[in-house]
């Protein structure tokens, strides 16, 4: 099975690098699964962000989320990562993910010309 490359949008890579070691390792392993065409162990679709966007859910005493889109053949795009501090999805984080997805879709459309 071929492995899709990861493309990090915005500060998503730096954010994951700043997570605690255990969280970072879990996030890395789950993204590796996605690159191989497998589902993460704990995920849910995020249609409120956009079609095909999914959320990796990481539970380690604190809650962390990684939002990505893997529906494109060329790569897995990591849209956003954050620590979730409330039960509800923070609107600021949803906004960031939507904005990055919109930029990605526009860039892909320009490349196809």
Predicted regions and their residues:
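Basic, Lys/Arg-enriched alpha-helical interface segments
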Residues: 1-63, 72-76, 83-113
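Short, surface-exposed charged micro-motifs
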Residues: 67
């Amino acid at each position: 099975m071929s492995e899709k490359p990861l493309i990090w949008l915005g500060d998503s890579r730096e954010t994951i690098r700043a997570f605690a070691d255990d969280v970072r390792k879990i996030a890395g392993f789950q993204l590796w699964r996605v690159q191989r065409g497998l589902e993460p162990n704990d995920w849910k679709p995020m249609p409120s962000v956009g079609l095909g966007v999914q959320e990796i859910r990481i539970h380690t005493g604190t809650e962390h989320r990684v939002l990505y889109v893997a529906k494109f053949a060329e790569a897995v795009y990591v849209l956003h990562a954050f620590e979730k501090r409330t039960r509800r999805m923070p609107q600021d984080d949803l906004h960031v993910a939507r904005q990055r997805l919109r930029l990605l879709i526009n860039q892909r459309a320009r490349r196809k010309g």
